[in-house]
Amino acid sequence: MIILSLYIYLGKGIAYGYFAESLLFIGLILLVKERRKIDVINSRSAKILYLLLVVNLLYIFRGTLEFSFLDTLRDGFIFNYVIFSFLLLLFIDDIQKFVQSIFYIYKYYAFILFILYILSLNGFIGSISLFGNIHLLFFKFGDISVHLFISFIFQISGLNKYKKPLDLVNLILIFLMFSVASSYSRGGMLSFILAFIVFYKYSRSVIIKQRLKQYFKYLPFVLIFSVLFLSTFKVNQNFQGRAVGVDQVANNFTSIFTTTDDGALNDNKIWRLLWWGKIIDYTFNGPYFAMGKGLGLSLADDDEILTTDLEGELRSPHNFNLTILARYGVFIFFIWIYWVVRQLKRLRDKSLSNLNLILICIQIAFLFNASFDVFLEGPMGAFPFWVFVGLDLIFEFYGYYNAKQELAIFEQTTQ
């Protein structure tokens, strides 16, 4: 849980410490060792993931024949991180305690994030690096928006409870940091909004909707506080020419649907669209239809994409789905899309429970942000995402949804 917390709080700042990969390797050994005591999840969703893991192993072998082993293995983690979903079987006897630990990680996420963000603005503290050349407090604001949504959804669903006035303080910090994140990331902003809309639309809980109405009373105060913060708190522009502010948030939102006067926003959108179009062309209409380009090569170099290197080496097209298409080809791409559709179509199930809805909406936030950024290709996004997927698989396979296990989780939440 400590390692998971570090990836949630710090993200890319510890990505090159390879803690997640080491944990995955150790967990896999333990899973093999305890295999006789564990029931294999054989739901259709799980079987699709097993298939992707097997295919990925073959692609890794194929890639090492032509490219360096380390580059191939690194690219192969796009699906290797799926293993985290099944490592949760090691905690099957204490799954409720495991879930409670995740709630606790997010209970004070907004507060800790706010402190870390303020510290990152200090020249000395903000420049500290422990792993590679990435600053320890290097924030990817799309990732932050996803975690803020999780913190928010845990609060309004009652999974995390707060004494007054901490409930209001937490809401203020969530939306304050969401405003900051929205200044830098359009994808993250939309991930939060879209996932919340889906949650509200499909929630059948009268209690949750009543709690939301109570929180809406504070909305004007929260908005005023956020606007004042954005208006008075001045931060230098980032490498994309974006700075914290109300105008920047507005420009980011309008640039999604229209062409703005901000050249950086337009350029950032154009190079993505051009790259995505090239991938679709050489797979669906080109020589990489069946097998893709494989693992081990840099897609940016091979596709002749010219961008700045201010975020480090660029290997993937800022879209998880199209990364799969480019590297694995059309067949694996459609298998992946089929898995995603299976996850989402459960929203229409009449037996949809509160926890099931929450876990699906969390997956929506992750997947949407991953459609505009390099997120699930690395441990900072993939580790927590596949943990949530694993919880979903376990609760569905063992029949814990709408059962005493789910009821106990909601009853055991404390202030």
State what each model feature region is:
Residues 1-36, 54-66, 78, 116-119:
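N-terminal signal-anchor transmembrane segment
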Residues 99-126, 138-206:
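Alpha-helical transmembrane segments of multi-pass inner-membrane proteins
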Residues 262-328:
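Long extracytoplasmic/lumenal interhelical loops at the membrane interface
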